[in-house]
């Protein structure tokens, strides 16, 4: 699959460590998930996914509780979930998922992040067909064979199970996210190193050094935007 998931997560977390930006993004996502459904994760699958992801980033309980209470309190603050697609240097493909309360601002900010870094925004569907929605679950303390056996016994399907350094990474259909976690928890797994619903490129590309530097600058500019929740791409950054 070409992605070292723990490295990617650690890089994102360290980049945001001093500003708590990642916590703010999770706070917004938790609020939206809780407001759109029940504020109880047992009956709100979208909220459960966000909370499981938040655990892997060590999001403080106070951030989570504040977002849920805000949703419970009937806040009138509304966010739209919007997806933008575009191209970076050398035609690299990028998907940007946002939560925004000002569509015009977000569209302008995303377009500027692309255009200022040798990229350009595309139309809906211009790159998404080259990505697959995927659940990615990572854990330690088991081998890939052991994980396969656990999932088979629980009658849970996975697309792929790979070993990455000290972790095992499970790739599955998005609707299998909770089933994979439940099966593993039932087998004694208490913590997950990765818990993501992502858009996974069907094939990765490698960029020349100068183009990769420009591409990473563009991704950083996109991730720095307040309204941007996730940036997906098809570039192998060698992480």
UniProtKB/Swiss-Prot annotation:
GO BP terms in the entry: regulation of DNA-templated transcription
UniProt entry keywords in alphabetical sequence: Cytoplasm, DNA-binding, Transcription, Transcription regulation
GO molecular function: DNA binding
Gene Ontology CC: cytosol
Principal subcellular localisation of the protein: cytoplasm
Subcellular location: Cytoplasm
Lineage: superkingdom: Bacteria
Residues that span the membrane, as ranges: none
A Pfam family this chain is assigned to: Transcrip_reg
PANTHER family: TRANSLATIONAL ACTIVATOR OF CYTOCHROME C OXIDASE 1
Protein family (similarity comment): Belongs to the TACO1 family. YeeN subfamily.
Name assigned to this protein: Probable transcriptional regulatory protein BC_0539
Taxonomic source organism: Bacillus cereus (strain ATCC 14579 / DSM 31 / CCUG 7414 / JCM 2152 / NBRC 15305 / NCIMB 9373 / NCTC 2599 / NRRL B-3711)
């Amino acid at each position: 699959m070409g992605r070292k998931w723990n490295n990617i997560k650690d890089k994102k977390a360290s980049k945001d460590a001093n500003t708590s930006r990642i916590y703010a993004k999770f706070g917004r996502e938790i609020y939206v998930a809780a407001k759109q459904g029940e504020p109880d994760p047992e009956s709100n699958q979208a909220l459960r996914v966000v909370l499981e992801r938040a655990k892997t980033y060590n999001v403080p309980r106070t951030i989570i509780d504040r977002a849920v209470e805000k949703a419970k309190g009937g806040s009138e603050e509304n966010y739209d979930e919007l997806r933008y697609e575009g191209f970076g240097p050398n035609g690299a493909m990028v998907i940007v998922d946002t939560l925004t309360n000002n569509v015009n601002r977000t569209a302008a900010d995303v377009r500027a992040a692309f255009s200022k870094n040798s990229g350009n925004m595309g139309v809906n569907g211009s790159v998404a067909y080259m990505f697959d929605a995927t659940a990615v679950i990572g854990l330690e303390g088991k081998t890939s064979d052991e994980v396969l056996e656990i999932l088979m016994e629980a009658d849970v399907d996975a697309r792929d199970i790979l070993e990455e350094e000290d972790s095992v990474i499970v790739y599955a259909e998005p609707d299998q996210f909770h089933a994979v976690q439940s099966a593993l928890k039932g087998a004694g797994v208490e913590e997950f190193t990765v818990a993501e619903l992502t858009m996974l490129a069907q094939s990765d590309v490698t960029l020349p050094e100068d183009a990769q530097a420009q591409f990473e600058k563009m991704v950083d500019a996109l991730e720095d935007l307040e309204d941007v929740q996730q940036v997906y791409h098809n570039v192998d950054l060698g992480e």
